[in-house]
Amino acid sequence: MCIRDRNSSASVAFVAPTNNGGSSITGYTVTSSPGGITATGTTSPINVTGLTNGTAYTFTIVATNAIGNSSPSTASSAVTPLVPFTCGTSTVADIDVNSYNTVLIGTQCWTKSNLKVTKYNDGTAIPDETANTAGWAGLTTGARSDYTGAASYIATYGYLYNWYAAKGVSTSGSTTYKNICPTDWHVPTDGEWTALETQLGGFSVAGGKMKSTGTTLWNSPNGGANNSSGFSALPGGQRLSPASVDIGNEASFWSATTDVTTGGGGWAWFRGLSRLSGFLNIASTSKDMGQSVRCLKD
């Protein structure tokens, strides 16, 4: 028996014998557990509707012929119907169960706020190096930092991650990368950031279309900001060594792409937004810089 889960329903496929005990089979009844929801048909597959999204179900099948009903089949493996993901209305959760709204920009689906996860999506911890004022710049594995140590900062701006965390480098020198983003999401490449820039009309206006408006979180003048894309960028600042800087003034987002021409492989591309203009700036910087992370759906 093979089950394919769908929104509030399941398609139950099975090998359908033509007779049972010498008499032709005239129909099949599929029954869910829990709920006892039934559906009938004369061949495989049979679609069972009226299921509750988020509930795990198993299914049994009974065959019917002129003699009567067969015994129920062995129960299937459990399946859980889920609401289909729709970018812009659906949310996505990280391994810490932080929930992120999503926004569709062109054909790209982005998280609408900065990442605030403390683990890679396999459960491996990302060390908190906020207090490591002397050693932050020498790190070559993933690390995170917050600006003030206040929970309210993390809730609003997320963590600042070095590039190694954004790339998923948990062991120095490793080329086997973990994923800091939720399953089916990833840190965008430099090329994917460029696609966003193009979609929004080019670097000279894209930043304004990405920045949240007003001067409550952005410092004045928050030039060019209209947030027409819904990206809702906030000025979380950066982590340098030994401290964090530019909260309210700058938003910086890692790409997953190394700058192969600068820094001997120790630099990577990022995108930056400033309070002063509506530009979307492209630059590269040392991988030990702490910056915000946004995730892009696969």
List the model feature ranges, each with a label.
Residues 36-43:
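Short beta-strand segments within Ig-like beta-sandwich modules, predominantly Fibronectin type-III
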Residues 34-36, 67:
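Solvent-exposed strand-loop boundary residues in beta-sheet-rich modules
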Residues 48-70:
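Beta-strand-rich modules
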Residues 84-298:
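Conserved positions within compact, well-structured domain cores
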Residues 4-24, 53, 67-84:
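Pro/Thr/Ser/Gly-rich low-complexity, intrinsically disordered linker/stalk tracts
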Residues 12, 45-47:
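Strand-loop-strand motifs at the edges of beta-sheets in extracellular beta-sandwich domains
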Residues 16-18, 32, 63:
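Hydrophobic beta-strand positions in extracellular immunoglobulin-like domains
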Residues 27-30:
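Short beta-strand elements bearing conserved aromatic residues within extracellular beta-rich modules
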